[in-house]
């Protein structure tokens, strides 16, 4: 580790922009700074929480996206899935604006690498690639225009963390795909002119090594596809567990359910009990991710969207209808136990059901009183429709 750090400190390292520094982006940025990279961002319009986190991480904050295009070599897009396309458009528009205002350089500018590391469908990745291809064509005859190299990517696992005991970094799996690798010949100053210098390991290869990159294919969308299929199982199972545990809690049966899971399926029991309490700060991001999974399975697999549109609604309810939606990583106050998560969600579901019932009753006054199962059970019998326990 020390030898690797010394090797990196002795060479020029390009600037990496991270849009935007959420939990994952901040973790990756802190790790890159540890290895000597300059990490930058642009925070116009972001929340005070995000601004504070970026400043605490000592990221350089540029005033505009044009500055990112001018000064950075790599842009990592790590945003909620719903912001993936708009973030790409920001950089595309900034590239055009920068090229229009810049003075033509003596040498062609180096390419700008845009790594989309978001939890989005292959179709979304291909759409962003098409956007940048169009921008590259538009700027082809402008000597100040920087070619944008798009790389499809995905992240599986939690943010990087440094182990203080052994100095090793825990790293998530960062998967990339596409026809263009992160190969960039190092730039050094020589005789007052910037010239290309061949190195044993170019800057792109160094960055791949630091990040622990795994290439999964040569096509745009392949890395995103792995992410979608993986998250459908892990986060999909989390959504099912949330429904199961909350319903069991409402029935007063949470403990018996947990006991049965621990006895019959201990690995699943361990996973879901841990996943449920880690979920609240991430629920808002997972809404869009489940919708992207629904699109992926429909577009690439031919399946109906219903299942993952349903899981999206689970996380939307948590985010919008419960106190859990206000949780932030590092500032947790609620939902730190399975019991608290299910209690808060049961309350949220009750309020949501009452709201929907009132809306339905406004259309059909008898709707809120109807129980289709009770009607089915008593159909044709001379028994009053009075539910047990009332």
Question: Language-model features: where?
Answer:
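Helical "substrate-binding/catalytic lid" subdomain
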Residues: 223-334
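Rossmann-fold dinucleotide-binding core
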Residues: 120-235
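C-terminal active-site/capping subdomain that shapes the small-molecule cofactor and substrate pocket
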Residues: 287-390
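Eukaryotic N-terminal targeting leaders
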Residues: 1-18, 98-105, 195-201, 209, ...
């Amino acid at each position: 580790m020390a030898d690797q750090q010394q090797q990196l400190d002795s060479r020029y390292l390009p600037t990496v922009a991270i849009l935007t520094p959420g939990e994952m982006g901040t973790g990756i940025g802190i790790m890159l700074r540890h290895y000597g990279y300059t990490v930058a961002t642009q925070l116009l319009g972001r929340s005070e929480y995000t601004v504070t986190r970026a400043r605490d991480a000592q990221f350089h904050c540029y005033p505009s996206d044009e500055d990112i295009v001018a000064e950075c070599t790599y842009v990592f897009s790590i945003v909620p899935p719903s912001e993936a396309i708009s973030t790409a458009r920001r950089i595309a528009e900034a590239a055009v604006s920068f090229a229009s205002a810049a003075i033509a350089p003596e040498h062609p500018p180096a390419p700008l690498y845009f790594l989309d590391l978001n939890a989005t469908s292959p179709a979304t990745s291909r759409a962003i690639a098409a956007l940048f291809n169009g921008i590259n064509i538009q700027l082809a005859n402008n000597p100040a225009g920087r070619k944008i190299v798009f790389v499809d990517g995905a992240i599986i696992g939690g943010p990087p963390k440094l182990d203080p005991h052994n100095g090793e970094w825990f790293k998530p799996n960062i998967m990339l795909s596409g026809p263009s690798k992160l190969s960039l010949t190092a730039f050094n100053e020589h005789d007052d002119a910037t010239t290309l210098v061949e190195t044993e390991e170019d800057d792109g290869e160094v960055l791949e090594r630091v990040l622990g990159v795994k290439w999964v294919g040569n096509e745009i969308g392949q890395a995103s596809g792995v992410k979608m299929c993986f998250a459908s199982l892990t986060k999909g199972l989390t959504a099912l567990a949330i429904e199961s545990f909350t319903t069991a809690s409402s029935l007063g049966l949470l403990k018996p359910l947990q006991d049965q899971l621990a006895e019959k399926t201990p690995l699943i029991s361990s996973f879901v009990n841990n996943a449920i309490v880690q979920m609240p700060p991430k629920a808002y991001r997972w809404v869009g991710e489940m919708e992207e999974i629904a699109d992926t399975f429909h577009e690439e697999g031919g399946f109906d969207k219903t299942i993952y549109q349903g899981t999206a609604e689970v996380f939307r309810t948590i985010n919008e209808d419960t106190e859990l939606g206000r949780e932030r990583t590092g500032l947790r106050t609620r939902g730190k136990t399975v019991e608290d998560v299910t209690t808060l969600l049961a309350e949220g579901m009750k309020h949501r059901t009452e709201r929907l019932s009132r809306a339905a009753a406004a259309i059909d006054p008898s709707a809120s009183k109807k129980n289709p199962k009770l009607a089915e059970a008593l159909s044709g019998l001379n028994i009053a429709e009075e539910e047990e326990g009332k």
